[in-house]
């Protein structure tokens, strides 16, 4: 079942209507029902366009975080053939908040790395909600250097609220791992294409979000801090998230205007 945001309620009403009409048509097929279904489907498309043409930065943040939004694993399954995952940083452990491996994209061998949030409670815990620890970033470095050795280009999918802020991560050198991974991206001898597919949260995103070409999905975000964090710091009030989201200029349009990204998808 789909999950609807508050401003998507008109779409939910129409989707429920479609479900009822299709159920009726399954039990008693008729041309008039099929015609009505077609009309309602068109109304849904029109409503989507109308709503999404004027949503606020905060609403776009909610869309970027939507539980039904495709994750890195979904993009790999849909775009990459013969994907072969690789694990571990060869120094401490495996961090499933960043996944990576080799496969073929349109017939060409590529390295794919990306944040993985998970899609349900179990997988979200397994992937630490897409918040990498130092070993995740060091794994990304290892894989990128391996790609460089074999002259293989890199595709990086960015979708994280930020690097994991736990004590253990700090003790194992979180800031150093982020800095070194960013440096690795900047100095790598093969092309890197970055795609921001959901949340681009602070240094945790920049670490694998630095590339030759940076693309960004229309309803994704990229920011130095979350609206909630900004609200609590600037206003000392967690209720100012709407104002904070607008002030942060975190949308794809904002990023394109200041040349942080190259293109909006």
Model-predicted regions and their roles:
Residues 1-82, 225-265:
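Amphipathic alpha-helical segments at domain termini/boundaries
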Residues 158-265:
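Conserved catalytic cores of soluble enzyme domains
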């Amino acid at each position: 079942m789909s999950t609807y945001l508050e401003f998507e309620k008109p779409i939910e009403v129409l989707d429920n209507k479609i479900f009822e009409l299709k159920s009726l048509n399954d039990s008693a097929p008729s041309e008039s029902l099929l015609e009505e279904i077609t009309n309602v489907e068109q109304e849904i498309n029109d409503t989507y366009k109308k709503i999404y043409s004027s949503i606020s930065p905060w609403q776009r943040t909610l869309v970027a975080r939507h539980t039904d939004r495709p994750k890195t694993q979904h993009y790999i399954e849909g775009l990459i053939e013969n994907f072969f995952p690789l694990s571990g940083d060869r120094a401490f452990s495996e961090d499933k908040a960043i996944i990576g491996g080799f496969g073929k994209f349109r017939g060409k061998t590529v390295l794919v790395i990306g944040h993985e949030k998970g899609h349900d409670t179990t997988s979200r815990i397994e992937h630490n909600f897409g918040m990498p620890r130092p070993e995740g970033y060091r794994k990304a470095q290892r894989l990128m250097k391996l790609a460089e050795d074999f002259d293989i280009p890199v595709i990086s999918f960015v979708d994280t609220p930020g690097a994991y802020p736990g004590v253990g991560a700090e003790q194992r050198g979180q800031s150093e791992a982020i800095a070194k991974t960013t440096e690795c991206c900047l100095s790598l001898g093969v092309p890197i294409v970055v795609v921001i597919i959901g949340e681009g949260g602070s240094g945790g995103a920049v670490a694998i979000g630095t590339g030759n070409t940076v693309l960004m999905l229309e309803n994704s975000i990229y920011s130095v801090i979350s609206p909630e964090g900004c609200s609590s710091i600037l206003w000392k009030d967690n209720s100012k998230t709407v104002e904070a989201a607008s002030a942060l200029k975190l949308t794809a349009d904002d990023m394109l205007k200041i040349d942080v990204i190259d293109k909006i998808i």
